[in-house]
């Protein structure tokens, strides 16, 4: 018998993490009055158990382990973890436990502790008379696709199926037999290596999919009975806010799918708690479909909601607790999944055969009565012969005759009376009228009917027929014979007491005709009502879908508008700031350029003075030394030539390639060398300043280009805003057309404003470009530059006024758009009212139809006959025999197919092994090649290091001609040595 039980809901709050402790507002918003209550921001919530942040893993498991014990007793169980991302779901479940975590026993979660409990209870409670088989499977729901974590190569789409024996299951999912808790943890680690995980701001290792670990336990006793229990360990992905997690790209798409599936799960729970709701949307997502048995089905479910106690996550915590409070009122109808043994089935079969024999005898007696009424010897008003009365003696005689006959139910005869009474005729072979359903028990006739349903089980070595019969039906079978005897003894008729008018054949014929007419009329009415109900439901569903689509579109448009408004405001502020920064940069750069120009002029004057000083000194030196150096005219000519070369090179600012600097320095004195160094430093500074000026000019150009690009981006955003406004207007016009209103909204002047703003921006850009070009060139008159700057500032002020006017116009347009949104909301409310009216009408129709159908069903039930019910029973028995035979044949064929598939799988595994061996051999060969290449590279590195170590630094020694010759000789030797080494290195690398 099925029993109802509520879903158990428990709540756990995790401790504050390091990020929350680092915040200034490191305060909690949660208080715990007792073990079953929690208060969050003044809102109280009550659950079966509440765990504080100081609670341990052991305490949580002790409150949850009853579900695992129920699975060992033959029930289905589910442990479900739900909560915000980073709230501790995976830690509580223990699905991501690594090998190092097993050393710290206190940190183990529900899954490893549950595995330990399962195998310990089997070892302690089993007395050797029972056999246990445990199978494990592991799956994840990623982006609304079911993936087999134990066999990731299983790329085919796994489908969800439903059957009476297995309930809801995944077709083609890998199941592994396990013999210890270590086997299960190894499978979990294999599955976790294939799971989808990503890093977010809220969690360093955030699960991007829902995972379900399924442990199926089958217990077979010595008498042949079986118990099956299934434990579902569900670790849901956390609900996320993109603003907090910072998800982008693929992670953002994953977050959308996760939030969508969790919202659909919430819709199912809301529908289950609503008493007026008839349809539960389990098929809207894969997650809700797999959890259908856990939510209102044949499963004992425990929901564990996890939350954060920090004030920053108070909204997510309250929504999570509301989810758990709503799920707490769901009731599940659970029963033990048990198959009866052969002895129990034999008792049931014996009781049924006994009932059948009694019913067959009773049907023979009734058929004999009917044949008597149809015969010519029957006259209305005459008493019924005693041999045909359905009393106990006649029934015993008929039973003996049926047992002695070979056909097992052939013709039966009764002994005649002294005055030659009528002989009993055999059972008529005339066709019986169609069967009409009848209630199982009636107060007037004390007769019972028992239904037997047989199904073949695929699991196990041999499939037998399993019958499910309630205890009430077995008790009714045991009391059947006594009730029938009492009926027969009480139904004897007296010849003297009113035998007139007991059976009127004309009335029976008329009643049968009326019954057939009533059947036809009621069937026609029922078909009409069914058609009308189907049409109404289709219309209702279509209107609901249209309304939902309209709501979704409106919500999306609102979100897009709000995002674009915020982006537009941010971009405007950024543009203004960039304009201000650009003006400040331009002014600062102009000042820098002017200062650099003044420095360059000063340096030029200094350089000219140095050159004049050098020329004067050269002339004075020539005049003083000319007399003393009369004999050395050639040398003086050389020195004069050298000084002329130096002066020419200094005047030109560049040195020729043919001049040797060392020769020049050798003939100079110390003062001349110092003057030369000063002049060279000055020239280097001048060159550096010129380079800086060029860099500043290029920076100005780049800033102007960036400013132009920012203006173009602003224009693009404004054009996108206008397009969005047009789309919104088109949506508004389409909604008005659907409501048969042909009034079109007035056109907004946004396009004109955009054109004016783009023209103004272009003018402003041209002014800026001209101003920047004029400011980049050095001006002769400072007064004209100041006037130009004032003129540019005036233009900028005018442009700012224009931009402000355009902003005001855009704000006016936004107010108009808000008015249009309010109108749309009013229309949506009207549509909702219309849909509610249609719903009320459909409910009224349904109530009327249910009343009418109930009346017609009562009439039909009152018009049923006992003969038809008996014939229905016989037909059901025949069909059951045929179905059992067909099921045995199907089971044999399925066994053959399984054997063939297992052989095919073995061949596939062999082929895969061979392929893996070939791949390993190829990898080994590639490793050998890589080792050879590494050795060659190491040799090349050694040779290059030797070359680098062999190089010598050549120092140029200042002095006489001999030292210069030795320096040149060492240069030539070093060059030849390096050339040889480079040629050798090239040959090595080739």
UniProtKB/Swiss-Prot annotation:
One Gene Ontology term of the molecular function aspect: actin filament binding
Ranges for region Disordered: 401-485, 732-788
Regions of compositional bias (Gly residues) in chain numbering: 406-418
One Gene Ontology biological process: actin filament bundle assembly
Domain of life: Eukaryota
Domain Kinesin motor: 6-330
Coiled-coil spans in chain: 513-948
Biased composition (Low complexity): 466-485, 733-781
GO cellular component: cell leading edge; cortical actin cytoskeleton; cytoplasm; microtubule
Protein task: Microtubule-associated force-producing protein that plays a role in organelle transport. Its motor activity is directed toward the microtubule's plus end. May connect microtubules to actin filaments. Associates with actin-based structures in cells and is likely involved in the organization of actin cytoskeletons in such structures.
Oligomeric form and interacting partners: Interacts with actin.
Record-stated family: Belongs to the TRAFAC class myosin-kinesin ATPase superfamily. Kinesin family. Kinesin subfamily.
Record note on domains: Composed of three structural domains: a large globular N-terminal domain which is responsible for the motor activity of kinesin (it hydrolyzes ATP and binds microtubule), a central alpha-helical coiled coil domain that mediates the heavy chain dimerization; and a small globular C-terminal domain which interacts with other proteins, vesicles and membranous organelles.
Name of this protein: Kinesin-related protein 5
């Amino acid at each position: 018998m099925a029993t109802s039980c509520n879903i158990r809901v428990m709540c756990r709050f995790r401790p504050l993490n390091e990020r929350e402790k680092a915040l200034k507002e490191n305060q909690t918003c949660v208080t715990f009055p007792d073990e079953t209550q929690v208060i969050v921001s003044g809102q109280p919530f009550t659950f079966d158990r509440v765990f504080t942040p100081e609670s341990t893993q052991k305490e949580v498991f002790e409150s949850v382990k009853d579900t695992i014990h129920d699975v060992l007793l033959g029930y289905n169980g589910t442990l479900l973890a739900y909560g915000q991302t980073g709230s501790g779901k995976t830690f509580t479940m223990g699905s991501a436990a690594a090998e190092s975590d097993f050393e710290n026993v206190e940190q183990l979660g529900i899954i490893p502790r549950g595995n330990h409990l399962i195998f310990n209870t089997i070892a302690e409670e089993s007395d050797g008379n029972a056999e246990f088989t445990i199978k494990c499977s592991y799956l994840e729901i990623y982006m609304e696709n079911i993936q087999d974590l134990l066999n990731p190569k299983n790329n085919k789409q796994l489908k969800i199926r439903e059957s009476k024996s297995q309930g809801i299951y995944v077709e083609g999912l890998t199941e592994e037999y396990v013999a210890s808790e270590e086997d299960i943890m190894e499978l979990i680690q294999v599955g976790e290596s294939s799971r989808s995980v990503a890093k977010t701001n809220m969690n360093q290792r955030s699960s991007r999919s829902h995972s379900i670990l399924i442990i199926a336990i089958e217990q077979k006793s010595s008498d042949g009975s079986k118990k099956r229990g299934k434990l579902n360990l569900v670790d849901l992905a956390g609900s996320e806010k993109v603003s907090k997690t910072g998800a982008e790209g693929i992670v953002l798409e994953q977050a959308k799918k996760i939030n969508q599936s969790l919202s659909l799960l919430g819709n199912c729970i809301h529908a289950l708690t609503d008493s007026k709701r008839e349809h539960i949307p389990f098929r809207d997502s894969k997650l809700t479909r797999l959890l259908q048995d856990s939510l209102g089905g044949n499963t004992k479910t425990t929901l564990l909601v996890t939350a954060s106690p920090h004030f920053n996550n108070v909204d997510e915590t309250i929504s999570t607790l509301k989810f758990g409070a709503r799920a707490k009122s769901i009731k599940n109808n659970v029963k033990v999944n048990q198959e009866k043994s052969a002895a129990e089935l034999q008792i049931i079969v014996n009781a049924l055969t006994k009932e059948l024999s009694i019913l067959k005898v009773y049907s023979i007696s009734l058929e004999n009565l009917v044949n008597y009424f149809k015969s010519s010897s029957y006259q209305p008003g005459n008493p019924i012969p005693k041999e045909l009365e359905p009393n106990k003696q006649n029934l015993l005689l008929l039973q003996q005759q049926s047992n002695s006959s070979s056909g097992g139910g052939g013709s039966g005869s009764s002994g005649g009376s002294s005055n030659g009474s009528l002989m009993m005729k055999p059972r008529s072979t005339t066709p019986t009228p169609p069967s009409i359903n009848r209630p199982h028990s009636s107060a007037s006739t004390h007769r019972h009917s028992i239904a037997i349903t047989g199904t073949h089980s695929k699991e196990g070595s041999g499939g037998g027929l399993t019958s499910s019969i309630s205890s009430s039906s077995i008790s009714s079978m045991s009391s059947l014979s006594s009730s029938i005897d009492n009926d027969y003894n009480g139904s004897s008729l007296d010849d003297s007491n009113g035998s007139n008018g007991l059976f009127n054949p004309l009335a029976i014929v008329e009643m049968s005709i009326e019954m057939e007419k009533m059947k036809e009329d009621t069937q026609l009415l029922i078909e009409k009502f069914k058609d009308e109900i189907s049409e109404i439901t289709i219309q209702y569903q279509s209107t609901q879908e249209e309304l939902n689509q309209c709501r979704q579109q409106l919500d999306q448009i609102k979100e897009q508008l709000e995002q674009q408004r915020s982006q537009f405001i941010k971009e405007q502020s950024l543009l203004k700031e960039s304009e201000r920064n650009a003006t400040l940069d331009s002014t600062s750069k102009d000042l820098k350029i002017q200062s650099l120009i003044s420095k360059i002029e000063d340096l030029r004057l200094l350089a000219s003075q140095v050159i004049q000083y050098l020329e004067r000194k050269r002339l004075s030196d020539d005049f003083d030394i000319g007399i003393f150096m009369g004999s050395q005219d050639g040398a003086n000519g050389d020195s004069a030539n050298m000084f002329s070369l130096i002066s020419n090179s200094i005047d030109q600012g560049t040195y020729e390639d043919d001049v040797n600097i060392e020769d020049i320095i050798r003939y100079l004195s110390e003062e001349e060398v110092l003057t030369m160094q000063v002049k060279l430093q000055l020239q280097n500074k001048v060159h550096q300043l010129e380079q800086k000026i060029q860099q500043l000019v290029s920076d100005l150009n780049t800033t102007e280009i960036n400013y132009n690009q920012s203006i173009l981006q602003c224009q693009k955003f404004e054009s996108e805003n206008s397009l969005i406004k047009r789309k919104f207007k088109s949506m508004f016009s389409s909604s008005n057309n659907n409501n048969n209103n042909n009034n079109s909204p007035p056109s907004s002047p946004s396009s004109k404003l955009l054109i004016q703003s783009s023209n103004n921006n272009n003018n402003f850009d041209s002014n800026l470009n001209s101003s920047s070009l004029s400011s980049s060139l050095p001006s002769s008159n400072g007064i004209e530059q100041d006037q130009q700057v004032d003129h540019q500032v005036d233009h900028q002020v005018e442009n700012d006024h224009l931009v402000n006017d355009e902003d005001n116009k855009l704000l006016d347009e936004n107010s108009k758009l808000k008015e249009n949104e309010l109108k749309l909301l009013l229309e949506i409310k009207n549509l909702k009212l219309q849909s509610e009216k249609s719903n009320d009408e459909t409910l009224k129709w349904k109530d009327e139809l249910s009343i009418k159908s109930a009346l017609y069903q009562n009439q039909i039930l009152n018009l049923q006959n006992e003969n038809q019910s008996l014939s229905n029973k016989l037909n059901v028995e025949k069909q059951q025999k045929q179905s059992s035979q067909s099921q045995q044949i199907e089971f044999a064929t399925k066994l053959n197919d399984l054997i063939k598939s297992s052989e095919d799988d073995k061949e596939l595994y062999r082929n895969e092994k061979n392929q893996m061996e070939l791949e390993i051999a190829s990898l080994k060969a590639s490793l050998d090649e890589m080792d050879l290449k590494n050795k060659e590279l190491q040799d090349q590195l050694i040779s290059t290091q030797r070359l680098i170590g062999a190089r010598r630094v050549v120092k140029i020694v200042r002095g006489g001609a001999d030292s210069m010759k030795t320096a040149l000789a060492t240069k030539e030797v070093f060059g030849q040595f390096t050339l040889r080494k480079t040629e050798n290195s090239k040959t090595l690398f080739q």
